[in-house]
Protein backbone atom coordinates (compact mmCIF):
# COMPACT_ATOMS: atom_id res chain seq x y z
CA UNK A 1 0.00 0.00 0.00
CA UNK A 2 1.30 3.43 -0.94
CA UNK A 3 1.61 6.33 1.50
CA UNK A 4 -1.51 7.89 -0.03
CA UNK A 5 -3.47 4.68 0.60
CA UNK A 6 -3.76 3.96 -3.13
CA UNK A 7 -3.17 0.56 -4.66
CA UNK A 8 -0.22 0.28 -7.04
CA UNK A 9 -2.50 0.32 -10.13
CA UNK A 10 -4.74 3.13 -8.88
CA UNK A 11 -4.65 6.65 -10.34
CA UNK A 12 -5.42 9.71 -8.26
CA UNK A 13 -8.91 11.25 -8.42
CA UNK A 14 -9.38 13.09 -11.73
CA UNK A 15 -11.60 16.14 -12.16
CA UNK A 16 -11.94 17.92 -15.52
CA UNK A 17 -13.78 21.25 -15.64
CA UNK A 18 -14.54 22.49 -19.16
CA UNK A 19 -15.08 26.13 -20.22
CA UNK A 20 -13.02 27.27 -17.26
CA UNK A 21 -12.05 30.59 -18.85
CA UNK A 22 -14.11 32.94 -20.99
CA UNK A 23 -12.16 33.72 -24.15
CA UNK A 24 -10.29 30.64 -25.37
CA UNK A 25 -12.06 28.36 -27.85
CA UNK A 26 -11.26 25.49 -25.50
CA UNK A 27 -10.36 25.79 -21.83
CA UNK A 28 -10.05 23.14 -19.14
CA UNK A 29 -8.98 22.99 -15.53
CA UNK A 30 -7.74 19.48 -14.91
CA UNK A 31 -7.04 18.23 -11.40
CA UNK A 32 -5.24 14.93 -10.84
CA UNK A 33 -4.92 14.57 -7.11
CA UNK A 34 -3.27 17.78 -5.94
CA UNK A 35 -1.81 18.59 -9.37
CA UNK A 36 -3.86 21.31 -11.09
CA UNK A 37 -3.26 22.55 -14.64
CA UNK A 38 -5.12 25.15 -16.70
CA UNK A 39 -5.14 24.10 -20.37
CA UNK A 40 -6.42 26.35 -23.16
CA UNK A 41 -6.73 25.86 -26.92
CA UNK A 42 -6.72 28.98 -29.12
CA UNK A 43 -7.33 29.06 -32.87
CA UNK A 44 -5.44 31.19 -35.39
CA UNK A 45 -6.49 31.31 -39.04
CA UNK A 46 -2.90 30.95 -40.25
CA UNK A 47 -0.02 28.49 -40.15
CA UNK A 48 3.77 28.75 -39.74
CA UNK A 49 5.64 29.76 -42.91
CA UNK A 50 6.79 26.20 -43.64
CA UNK A 51 3.14 25.10 -44.00
CA UNK A 52 1.78 27.99 -46.07
CA UNK A 53 0.01 26.70 -49.16
CA UNK A 54 0.19 23.08 -47.99
CA UNK A 55 -3.45 22.86 -46.96
CA UNK A 56 -2.35 21.44 -43.61
CA UNK A 57 -2.84 22.78 -40.10
CA UNK A 58 -0.54 22.84 -37.09
CA UNK A 59 -0.77 22.33 -33.34
CA UNK A 60 1.87 23.75 -31.02
CA UNK A 61 2.12 24.00 -27.25
CA UNK A 62 3.55 26.16 -24.51
CA UNK A 63 3.99 25.01 -20.91
CA UNK A 64 4.61 27.09 -17.83
CA UNK A 65 4.59 26.70 -14.07
CA UNK A 66 3.36 29.69 -12.10
CA UNK A 67 5.91 30.80 -9.50
CA UNK A 68 4.25 29.27 -6.44
CA UNK A 69 2.94 26.10 -8.06
CA UNK A 70 5.79 24.34 -6.25
CA UNK A 71 6.84 24.06 -2.62
CA UNK A 72 9.25 26.97 -2.99
CA UNK A 73 8.89 29.86 -5.43
CA UNK A 74 10.01 29.09 -8.99
CA UNK A 75 11.42 32.00 -10.99
CA UNK A 76 9.49 32.85 -14.15
CA UNK A 77 11.25 31.92 -17.41
CA UNK A 78 10.76 35.48 -18.69
CA UNK A 79 12.95 36.77 -15.86
CA UNK A 80 15.72 34.34 -16.87
CA UNK A 81 15.50 35.62 -20.48
CA UNK A 82 15.29 32.06 -21.78
CA UNK A 83 13.12 28.94 -21.56
CA UNK A 84 14.78 26.25 -19.47
CA UNK A 85 15.47 22.83 -20.95
CA UNK A 86 12.78 21.03 -18.97
CA UNK A 87 10.08 23.47 -20.08
CA UNK A 88 11.15 23.18 -23.73
CA UNK A 89 11.13 19.39 -23.54
CA UNK A 90 7.64 19.29 -22.00
CA UNK A 91 6.01 21.71 -24.41
CA UNK A 92 7.44 19.80 -27.37
CA UNK A 93 6.06 16.58 -25.87
CA UNK A 94 2.58 18.10 -25.50
CA UNK A 95 2.64 19.36 -29.09
CA UNK A 96 3.78 15.99 -30.48
CA UNK A 97 1.16 14.11 -28.48
CA UNK A 98 -1.73 16.23 -29.72
CA UNK A 99 -0.55 16.42 -33.33
CA UNK A 100 -0.57 12.64 -33.44
CA UNK A 101 -4.31 12.69 -32.70
CA UNK A 102 -5.25 15.03 -35.53
CA UNK A 103 -5.50 14.74 -39.31
CA UNK A 104 -3.73 17.98 -40.23
CA UNK A 105 -5.03 17.94 -43.80
CA UNK A 106 -8.60 17.70 -42.51
CA UNK A 107 -7.94 20.57 -40.08
CA UNK A 108 -6.85 22.86 -42.90
CA UNK A 109 -4.55 25.88 -42.68
CA UNK A 110 -5.16 26.80 -39.05
CA UNK A 111 -2.91 26.80 -36.00
CA UNK A 112 -4.18 25.63 -32.64
CA UNK A 113 -2.14 26.99 -29.75
CA UNK A 114 -2.19 24.89 -26.60
CA UNK A 115 -1.20 26.72 -23.42
CA UNK A 116 -0.65 24.75 -20.22
CA UNK A 117 -0.18 26.66 -16.98
CA UNK A 118 0.56 24.59 -13.90
CA UNK A 119 -1.25 26.13 -10.94
CA UNK A 120 -0.18 23.49 -8.43
CA UNK A 121 2.40 20.75 -8.93
CA UNK A 122 2.32 17.45 -7.09
CA UNK A 123 3.81 15.14 -9.69
CA UNK A 124 2.77 14.31 -13.24
CA UNK A 125 2.42 17.85 -14.56
CA UNK A 126 3.39 16.91 -18.14
CA UNK A 127 1.05 13.91 -18.29
CA UNK A 128 -1.76 15.91 -16.69
CA UNK A 129 -1.17 18.69 -19.24
CA UNK A 130 -1.56 16.27 -22.15
CA UNK A 131 -4.71 14.68 -20.75
CA UNK A 132 -6.34 18.05 -20.06
CA UNK A 133 -5.18 19.69 -23.28
CA UNK A 134 -6.82 16.98 -25.35
CA UNK A 135 -10.22 17.94 -23.92
CA UNK A 136 -9.54 21.64 -24.60
CA UNK A 137 -8.51 20.70 -28.15
CA UNK A 138 -11.76 18.81 -28.73
CA UNK A 139 -13.81 21.79 -27.54
CA UNK A 140 -11.89 24.14 -29.85
CA UNK A 141 -12.23 21.85 -32.88
CA UNK A 142 -15.93 21.34 -32.18
CA UNK A 143 -16.47 25.11 -32.24
CA UNK A 144 -14.84 25.21 -35.66
CA UNK A 145 -17.00 22.29 -36.79
CA UNK A 146 -20.18 24.00 -35.61
CA UNK A 147 -19.34 27.20 -37.51
CA UNK A 148 -18.32 25.44 -40.71
CA UNK A 149 -18.48 21.64 -40.75
CA UNK A 150 -15.30 19.82 -41.77
CA UNK A 151 -15.50 17.51 -44.76
CA UNK A 152 -13.64 15.02 -42.55
CA UNK A 153 -13.68 15.48 -38.77
CA UNK A 154 -9.98 15.95 -37.92
CA UNK A 155 -9.59 14.35 -34.47
CA UNK A 156 -8.85 10.70 -35.08
CA UNK A 157 -8.58 9.22 -31.60
CA UNK A 158 -8.43 9.94 -27.87
CA UNK A 159 -4.99 10.66 -26.38
CA UNK A 160 -3.99 10.56 -22.72
CA UNK A 161 -0.80 10.28 -20.70
CA UNK A 162 0.25 8.76 -17.38
CA UNK A 163 3.34 8.39 -15.27
CA UNK A 164 4.57 5.07 -13.92
CA UNK A 165 7.61 4.13 -11.92
CA UNK A 166 9.35 1.84 -9.48
CA UNK A 167 9.29 3.10 -5.90
CA UNK A 168 11.17 0.83 -3.52
CA UNK A 169 10.43 -2.55 -5.09
CA UNK A 170 6.88 -1.63 -6.13
CA UNK A 171 5.77 -0.75 -9.63
CA UNK A 172 3.22 2.06 -9.30
CA UNK A 173 0.91 4.12 -11.49
CA UNK A 174 0.42 7.90 -11.46
CA UNK A 175 3.18 9.06 -9.14
CA UNK A 176 2.71 12.01 -6.81
CA UNK A 177 5.71 14.20 -5.99
CA UNK A 178 6.54 12.27 -2.82
CA UNK A 179 6.88 9.09 -4.90
CA UNK A 180 8.44 10.72 -7.95
CA UNK A 181 11.45 12.18 -6.18
CA UNK A 182 12.47 8.82 -4.67
CA UNK A 183 11.58 6.62 -7.67
CA UNK A 184 14.23 4.18 -8.90
CA UNK A 185 12.62 4.26 -12.35
CA UNK A 186 10.52 7.15 -13.66
CA UNK A 187 8.48 6.91 -16.88
CA UNK A 188 5.91 8.94 -18.80
CA UNK A 189 3.78 7.24 -21.42
CA UNK A 190 1.43 8.77 -24.01
CA UNK A 191 -1.13 6.45 -25.60
CA UNK A 192 -4.21 6.40 -27.79
CA UNK A 193 -7.45 4.67 -26.87
CA UNK A 194 -6.67 1.66 -29.07
CA UNK A 195 -3.67 0.83 -26.85
CA UNK A 196 -0.94 2.06 -29.21
CA UNK A 197 1.92 4.24 -28.02
CA UNK A 198 2.72 7.80 -29.05
CA UNK A 199 5.69 8.36 -26.76
CA UNK A 200 7.57 6.52 -24.02
CA UNK A 201 10.00 8.42 -21.81
CA UNK A 202 11.83 6.33 -19.24
CA UNK A 203 14.85 6.77 -17.01
CA UNK A 204 16.61 4.54 -14.51
CA UNK A 205 17.22 7.22 -11.89
CA UNK A 206 19.43 5.01 -9.71
CA UNK A 207 20.44 2.15 -11.99
CA UNK A 208 19.33 0.04 -14.94
CA UNK A 209 16.04 -1.82 -15.12
CA UNK A 210 15.15 -5.03 -16.91
CA UNK A 211 13.06 -5.74 -19.99
CA UNK A 212 10.65 -7.64 -17.74
CA UNK A 213 10.24 -4.57 -15.52
CA UNK A 214 9.73 -2.39 -18.59
CA UNK A 215 6.97 -4.65 -19.88
CA UNK A 216 5.26 -4.66 -16.47
CA UNK A 217 5.43 -0.86 -16.32
CA UNK A 218 3.97 -0.51 -19.81
CA UNK A 219 1.10 -2.84 -18.89
CA UNK A 220 0.46 -0.61 -15.88
CA UNK A 221 0.60 2.49 -18.10
CA UNK A 222 -2.02 1.03 -20.43
CA UNK A 223 -4.40 0.53 -17.51
CA UNK A 224 -3.84 4.11 -16.38
CA UNK A 225 -4.21 5.61 -19.86
CA UNK A 226 -7.58 3.88 -20.25
CA UNK A 227 -8.75 5.35 -16.94
CA UNK A 228 -7.63 8.83 -18.04
CA UNK A 229 -9.48 8.45 -21.35
CA UNK A 230 -12.60 7.43 -19.48
CA UNK A 231 -12.27 10.65 -17.43
CA UNK A 232 -12.00 12.60 -20.71
CA UNK A 233 -15.12 10.90 -22.06
CA UNK A 234 -17.01 11.59 -18.84
CA UNK A 235 -16.12 15.29 -19.16
CA UNK A 236 -16.90 15.59 -22.88
CA UNK A 237 -20.08 13.48 -22.83
CA UNK A 238 -21.81 13.66 -26.22
CA UNK A 239 -19.31 16.24 -27.48
CA UNK A 240 -16.86 13.39 -28.10
CA UNK A 241 -19.08 11.45 -30.51
CA UNK A 242 -17.32 12.73 -33.66
CA UNK A 243 -13.87 11.57 -32.50
CA UNK A 244 -12.47 8.86 -34.73
CA UNK A 245 -15.40 8.88 -37.13
CA UNK A 246 -13.87 10.99 -39.89
CA UNK A 247 -17.42 12.08 -40.66
CA UNK A 248 -19.13 15.39 -41.25
UniProtKB/Swiss-Prot annotation:
Give the record's GO biological process terms: rRNA catabolic process; rRNA processing; tRNA processing
Reactions that this protein is recorded to catalyse? tRNA(n+1) + phosphate = tRNA(n) + a ribonucleoside 5'-diphosphate
Query: Broadest EC class?
Result: transferase
Report keywords, A-Z.
Answer: Nucleotidyltransferase, RNA-binding, rRNA processing, Transferase, tRNA processing, tRNA-binding
Q: Which InterPro entries match?
A: ExoRNase_PH_dom1, ExoRNase_PH_dom2, ExoRNase_PH_dom2_sf, PNPase/RNase_PH_dom_sf, Ribosomal_Su5_D2-typ_SF, RNase_PH, RNase_PH_bac-type, RNase_PH_CS
Q: Where does the record locate the signal sequence feature?
A: none
Nucleotide-binding found in the keyword field: no
* UniProt superkingdom: Bacteria
| Pfam families referenced in this protein's UniProt entry, alphabetically | RNase_PH, RNase_PH_C
Tagged with keyword Iron: no
Care to name a GO molecular-function term for this sequence? Answer: 3'-5'-RNA exonuclease activity
- List ligand-binding residues for phosphate: 86, 124-126
- Quaternary arrangement and interactors, per the entry? Homohexameric ring arranged as a trimer of dimers.
Task performed by this protein: Phosphorolytic 3'-5' exoribonuclease that plays an important role in tRNA 3'-end maturation. Removes nucleotide residues following the 3'-CCA terminus of tRNAs; can also add nucleotides to the ends of RNA molecules by using nucleoside diphosphates as substrates, but this may not be physiologically important. Probably plays a role in initiation of 16S rRNA degradation (leading to ribosome degradation) during starvation.
Report the sequence similarity comment from the record: Belongs to the RNase PH family.
This chain's protein is named Ribonuclease PH
Source organism: Clostridium perfringens (strain SM101 / Type A)
Gene this protein is translated from: rph
Amino acid sequence: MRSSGRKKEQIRPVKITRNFTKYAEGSVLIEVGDTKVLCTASIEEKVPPFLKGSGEGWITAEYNMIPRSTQSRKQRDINKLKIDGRTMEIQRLIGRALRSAVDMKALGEKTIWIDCDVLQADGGTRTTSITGSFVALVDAVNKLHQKKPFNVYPIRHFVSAVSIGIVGEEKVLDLCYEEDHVAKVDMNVVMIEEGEFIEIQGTGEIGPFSRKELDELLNLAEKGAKQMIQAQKNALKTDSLWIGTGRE
